[in-house]
Amino acid sequence: MTNNAGLIWLIGCKGMLGTELSRLLEKTELPFVGTDREIDITDMAALTAAAEKQPVRWIINSAAYTAVDKAEDDAEVCRALNTRGAANIAAIANNTEAKLIHISTDYVFDGNGNRPYREEDETAPTGVYGLTKRDGEISVLKNNPRSYIIRTAWLYGKHGNNFVHTMLRLMNERDEVKVVNDQRGSPTWTFDLASVIITLIKTVDSGKEIPFGVYHFTNEGNITWFDFAKEIYKQGREQGRITKDCAVSPCSSAEYPAKVKRPAYSVLDKSKIKTALGIKIPAWDESLREFIKKQ
């Protein structure tokens, strides 16, 4: 790591969000360094040694264990990364007097709601992944009060496996795809989330006081996965990314049993972050159109 005053340290720089953040940070005047698996976030000594190599004023933690079903059989590893790793990073931030941005998830809720979840709503995770992320949030705020936790949902982007990539591939291979129509949420393009993270940093750096704590961010609007798939097909055909006819059919979650029940409703209320930063969040279908255009 370079010895450049006021660095942003991006942890998890090779993940789906981290790769997008790296790309956007490179276009700013903000000095940053990115690390990934070469530094074990479960190893406090390794984190401490890395932190001592440069002055850090911001840490972004986009590292996480995100395999929701696999986590049920891999609970110790999941907890090590999502809870202990998050706690370690927060402690490092506190020791270096850095501000922390920690990425979390809609899975901290049980998905039984009927209105968009607010930041202060009671959490009730139903699986190992959600539980470890919820416990990670608690540890972050305990270990470093100068933390921003951003919960997001239905994340997709250029890098890594995600729903949009899967649908584009399947729709070019099959005559029909079946997609669940009883789970409602809001897609999030990594470009939009990465952009708002950078906006948060720049806003705080400018001297504006943005209260620490939990914030929600997704794209605007809420839909089912079936709705999402239909729009992917529509946009894919219009933009030449899908070159054959493919029927998109609805089905129930019961037809695709999984180890962990997916949230039936995971819409997040974004009023707090919109007010705090004075931002307008793009609609989910607008962002999807731009994403497919860039593929």
What are these regions, as identified by a protein language model?
Residues M44-T83, I92:
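NAD(P)H-binding glycine-rich loop region in Rossmannoid oxidoreductase-like domains
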Residues T203-P257:
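Mid/C-terminal beta-alpha module of Rossmann-like enzyme folds, strongest
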Residues K158, Q183-A194, Y215-Q235, E290:
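Substrate-binding strand-loop-helix patch
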Residues E26-A49:
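Adenosine-cofactor binding site in Rossmann-like domains, unifying the SAM/SAH pocket
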Residues I138-T199:
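NAD(P)-dependent short-chain dehydrogenase/reductase
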Residues G6, A283-Q295:
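Amphipathic terminal alpha-helices
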Residues A80, R84-N88, V108-I150, W154-L155:
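Catalytic helix-loop patch of NAD(P)-dependent Rossmann-fold dehydrogenases
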Residues G6-L25:
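N-terminal Rossmann NAD(P)H-binding glycine-rich loop of SDR-like oxidoreductase domains
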